[in-house]
Regions:
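N-terminal secretory signal peptides that target proteins for export/translocation
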Residues: 1-7
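N-terminal regions of proteins, emphasizing targeting and processing segments when present
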Residues: 8, 23-27
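Periplasmic c-type cytochrome electron-transfer domains
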Residues: 26-519
Length: 519
């Protein structure tokens, strides 16, 4: 078992004027996680270690490199719907559930009461009417470009730090990741059902900074400044922070959940014992459904442990739909929004105790777990291989870990081997938290993550962003309009890699971008 000292996971006090408490990893000083995979024989484990070792040969593509998600990889032709295909090894018997989940993912929910009783319950406060509204064709959302427009595929998370000993203890016990605004809850909802005022509008302005690279090329970076306007229920709390979050792509989520804890934690180095300047930390959370301590993997700050938890969270916060895992039919409404709590809800007792009753949550979860990663393009092209070598040489792979092998003991609910079982995958992420510098800080604590900490996002499919979403928008708030801009925003632990990129020759820098676009 790996023992993580509690003193290595603390959050610095960032808010002046408030009693801020350190968040430790456990009251008993340590958390125990497995250090060795229990699903493999000794011989299998050695094979996995050999095949996942970083390559040193960039003269040719590695075996199976083009199949980024193993046997689940989609080899469908590139189109705007390339992120919407099922795991290639799903099988006809399970594709029916995938397509049912897809229909529910695209379903437009309506307010109550409605003649379509199985699909009512929207809101009362909400950000979008469907999952697909945020995850455009199962890809990334769009950032808000102009103040006053609905921020449909981007949300503002609201949170404050602990201000009482009891709240601090909740953080230490992982029973809370932060605390909502007293009036507006954990998220600003800029839409509402008829008869109710929306909470407010997202405002944004951008400032620009020009960066000159070593070869003389200039790149303009834009920094967003988000705020809230037209607040309907009074001001935000003085301690409330806001953080813009663009919806991420949906591909490969089931594979990410299938990576063994031990393999992720092997890359954690909170004390930087190897001296490379990288000190990735595990996100420790609770599985919302079971209440058990778990490894966070999903969300911009790795605040959710499972795909199901992520889906239930989105149903509740974004659409205002209750599920068995989050049964409140009023979503993010608070006691200071009393009219919201008197609006009709969509609970139909003959269907169940929640608005998304019966199989809805499991089907949308299954769909989300089985959106296939597309096969790579041009993996063997000389310029892409050169870019791959430059990616490694610049230090990018220190956080963007190229490959894993998923668990071999995964079963679906029907007892059959899960499609994600024992696959060699290439997500290019370590799924750990890293300090990304003040430039990307949102000042918002999320569990063991401070405002400067972000989960390393997987890079698979990143080269198809424009094709699927209709525009390029990278990083948590979509500020980066190109991959070059995204890299130049890296700071903190990633500053060395960022500077190495900025110092590359024009040809080397373009080769690295070509490599990323091939993913």
């Amino acid at each position: 078992m790996i023992r993580i000292p509690a003193t290595r996971a603390f959050l610095p006090a960032l808010a002046a004027g408030f009693v801020v408490f350190a968040v430790t990893l456990a009251a008993a000083d340590v958390l125990n996680f497995p250090t060795v995979r229990a699903d493999l024989t000794t011989e299998q484990l050695k094979r996995v270690q050999d095949i996942t070792r970083p390559t040193t040969d960039f003269s040719k593509a590695e075996p199976y490199e083009a199949m980024e998600s193993g046997a689940t990889t989609s080899i469908a032709p590139v189109s705007r719907d390339i992120f919407s295909h099922p795991s290639a090894n799903l099988g006809l018997d399970r594709e029916q559930n995938f397509h049912l989940g897809n229909a529910l993912f695209r379903q437009l929910w309506v307010s109550s009461p409605s003649s379509t009783q199985a699909t009512d319950g929207l809101g009362p406060l909400f950000n979008a009417r469907s999952c697909q509204s945020c995850h455009i064709r199962d890809g990334r959302g769009h950032p808000l470009e102009t103040a006053g427009q609905p921020a449909t595929s981007m949300v503002l998370r609201l949170a404050r730090p602990a201000i009482t000993p009891e709240e601090a203890q909740s953080l230490r016990d992982f029973k809370a990741i932060n605390f909502p605004d007293a009036t507006y809850g954990a998220q600003l909802q800029d839409l509402a059902v008829p008869g109710l005022a929306a909470e407010g509008k997202v405002t944004v302005s951008y400032s620009e900074e020009t960066v000159t690279l070593k070869d003389g090329e200039t790149v303009t970076l834009r920094k967003p400044h988000f705020g809230v306007g037209d607040l309907a229920y009074g001001p935000l709390g003085e301690a409330t922070t806001i953080s813009a979050r663009v919806a991420p792509a949906m591909i490969g989520l089931g594979l990410i959940e299938a990576i063994p804890e031990a393999d992720i934690l092997t890359n954690a180095d909170p004390d930087d014992k190897n001296g490379d300047g990288i000190h990735g930390r595990a996100a420790i959370v609770r599985d919302h459904r079971t209440g058990q301590i778990a490894l966070g993997r999903f969300g911009w700050k790795a605040q959710n442990a499972t795909v199901r938890d992520q889906v239930a969270d989105a149903f509740s916060a974004d659409i205002g739909i209750s599920t068995p895992d989050r049964p409140n039919p009023y979503g993010d409404c608070t006691a200071k929004e009393p009219r919201c709590l008197t609006m009709p809800n969509g609970v139909q007792k003959r269907l169940g105790d929640t608005e998304a009753a019966g199989p809805i949550l499991p089907l949308v979860t299954f769909y989300s777990e089985n959106l296939a990663v597309p096969a790579r393009r041009k993996a063997s092209f000389p310029d892409v291989l050169h870019g791959k070598e430059t990616f490694y040489r610049s230090g990018c792979a220190a956080c963007h870990t190229p490959k894993f092998v998923t668990r071999d003991d995964l079963k679906d609910s029907d007892g059959k081997d899960a499609p994600q079982a024992f696959q060699l995958i290439w997500p290019y992420s370590d799924f750990l938290l890293h300090d990304m510098g003040e430039g990307l800080s949102d000042g918002q604590q999320v569990g063991v993550a401070s405002g400067r900490d972000w989960r390393t996002p997987p890079l698979w499919g990143i080269g198809l962003t424009q094709t699927v979403s209709g525009q390029q928008a990278y990083l948590h708030d979509g500020r980066a309009r190109t991959l070059t801009e995204a890299i130049l925003w890296h700071g903190g632990e990633a500053e060395r890699a960022r500077n190495a990129f900025a110092d590359l020759s024009t040809d080397d820098r373009q080769a690295l971008i070509n490599f990323l676009e091939s993913l």
